[in-house]
Swiss-Prot record:
Family matches, as PROSITE patterns: NDPK, NDPK_LIKE
Record gene name: ndk
An example Gene Ontology biological process: UTP biosynthetic process
Species name: Rhizobium johnstonii (strain DSM 114642 / LMG 32736 / 3841)
Quaternary assembly: Homotetramer.
UniProt name for this protein: Nucleoside diphosphate kinase
């Protein structure tokens, strides 16, 4: 499998509970390498822009509220098949449906406060990385 890069976020529900290290360790233990990382407090405009694909969904307002309620760690992860590997270690969107040992099973509070984000395909990974990072901020 090819070496890929994907975009990941440790969401405010998790940073507020001081889980940045614990979640990053789970990503690293799964074979992913953090090649860029920064801590941001998203503006409403940034959150709405990032999640624009969901703007007509009923949970959009709540999603933007949650994402602007505290700091987020935005990261670029690199590794073999990184996009799928990250989705696997994250677990299902709703933690009630997440497999044992996944980040969302272990740490998420609810479908809205589900601790992590990960790109779902190569195209979205490229877009999402570009949304938060310049090329020089990524050090492989
Ligand atoms: N979300 C929510 N309620 C829902 C579906 C999604 O609050 O019914 C939030 C949740 O935080 C999720 C995000 O919207 O992580 C993006 O949804 P998506 O379906 O893309 O899930 P993901 O890719 O994050 O698993």
């Amino acid at each position: 499998m090819a070496i890929e890069r994907t975009f990941s976020m440790i969401k405010p529900d998790a940073t507020k509970r001081n889980l940045t290290g614990a979640i990053t360790k789970m990503l690293e233990d799964a074979g992913l390498r953090v090649v860029a990382s920064k801590r941001v407090w998203m503006s409403r405009r940034e959150a709405e822009g990032f999640y624009a694909v969901h703007k007509d969904r009923p949970f959009f307002g709540e999603l933007v509220e949650g994402m602007t309620s505290g700091p987020t760690i935005v990261q670029v992860l690199e590794g073999e098949g990184a996009i799928l590997k990250n989705r696997e270690i994250m677990g299902a969107t709703n933690p009630a449906n997440a497999d044992e040992g996944t980040i969302r099973k272990v740490h998420a509070l609810s479908i809205g406060e589900n601790s992590v984000h990960g790109s779902d395909a190569p195209e979205t990974a490229a877009q999402e990385i570009k949304y938060w990072f310049s090329d020089t901020e990524i050090v492989g």
